[in-house]
A protein has these predicted regions:
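A short beta-loop-alpha structural element at the N-terminal edge
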Residues: 1-11, 149-161
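Short, charged/polar, Gly/Pro-enriched secondary-structure boundary elements
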Residues: 144-148, 272-273
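Internal alpha/beta loop-helix hairpins
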Residues: 116-134
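Active-site-proximal cofactor/substrate-binding loop regions of enzyme domains
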Residues: 1-105
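Intrinsically disordered, low-complexity, positively biased terminal segments
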Residues: 21, 44-47, 51-53, 57-58, ...
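Conserved catalytic-core motifs of GNAT/GCN5-like acyltransferases
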Residues: 73, 110-112, 129-142, 258-269
Length: 283
């Protein structure tokens, strides 16, 4: 993959991942800033992990993409898509194998999967365990938000706290990926108390990533994210696995609706992955 492929990668990913009428509506709601942030993310991944980013071309057109990254001892698949014309051809399997080559030497690996049957089958065949998830979505009941949440806005020096929490929860720090989220779209929230500590990268009330060493701290961070949802707009909490039961009462209490979503796929030696709401592209 080359930096100039970002436009084509965005087009291929958007058409491959957003096929239903409901998905198309999500695409139409994207602002120009949203689109540019996604392209910037592809370039960010390429800059930090050039050996993990691959595109497949057919007649000069990008037909498939695989983007992976390595942070400390953990490998993450950030994106794997194949356009409709090239499905069931083995292209997705080949791209995944290319991306997995960069996992050599890593102790753990993670993927946030779609619900597409072929994707889940492919990851299971590669030795990943699949953990079903829920998504919570809706307008926040602001009267349900607890008062006196012990959560503050984060500062640059809190990146080390976030790294410590990441290593305890997921086995590796996000490093430049968290910095990228904060530079492009998100705000850092931090909680520290005797029982534990944690952080969240929040975007318009939705947690882009949240990790903590204590479930009570995690609940407060999630409430603090939801509190920042602009009035009348909808919040979204993604990748709620069975290990994140601490988050379900918060979502229900806030008036969000729960629906099934794609699995988190894991392999090898990772942290407890709880309390933890991962980032889709960065986990």
């Amino acid at each position: 993959m080359k930096p100039e492929d970002a436009e084509a990668v965005y087009h291929t990913a958007s058409t491959a991942l957003f096929e239903s009428p409901e998905d198309q509506e999500v695409l139409r709601r994207r602002t120009p800033e949203d689109v540019e942030n996604r392209k910037a993310r592809y370039k960010h991944s390429l800059r930090h992990d050039p050996g993990g980013a691959w595109v497949a071309e057919d007649d000069g057109r990008v037909s498939g993409v695989a983007i992976s990254l390595v942070r400390e001892r953990v490998w993450v698949l950030s994106l794997l898509v194949v356009d409709a014309d090239h499905r069931n051809t083995g292209l997705g399997k080949n791209l995944l194998q290319r991306a997995l080559a960069s996992a050599d030497g890593c102790e753990g690996a993670m993927i946030a999967s779609s619900q597409h049957p072929a994707a889940m089958r492919r990851y299971a065949s590669a030795g990943f365990d699949l953990h079903p998830t829920l998504t919570a979505y809706g307008v926040v009941r602001r009267e349900a938000i607890p008062s006196g949440l012990a959560v503050r806005d984060g500062e640059e020096q809190d990146l080390e706290l976030a790294a410590e929490v990441d290593r305890a929860v997921r086995g590796a720090a996000h490093g430049p990926d968290l910095e990228h989220l904060l530079a492009t779209s998100c705000r850092l929230l931090v909680a520290e108390r005797p029982s534990g500590k944690g952080y969240a990268a929040e975007w318009n009330g939705s947690p882009a990533v949240l990790a903590a060493t204590d479930p009570v701290v995690a609940r407060d961070l999630l409430w603090a994210c939801l509190e920042r949802t602009p009035p009348g707009e909808k919040a979204e909490v993604n990748w709620i696995t069975g290990r994140q039961n601490w988050s379900v009462p918060v979502a229900i209490g806030a008036g969000l609706s729960l629906s099934p979503a794609g699995p988190i796929c894991t392999r090898g030696d990772l942290g407890p992955l709880a309390p933890y709401l991962p980032s889709g592209p960065f986990l």
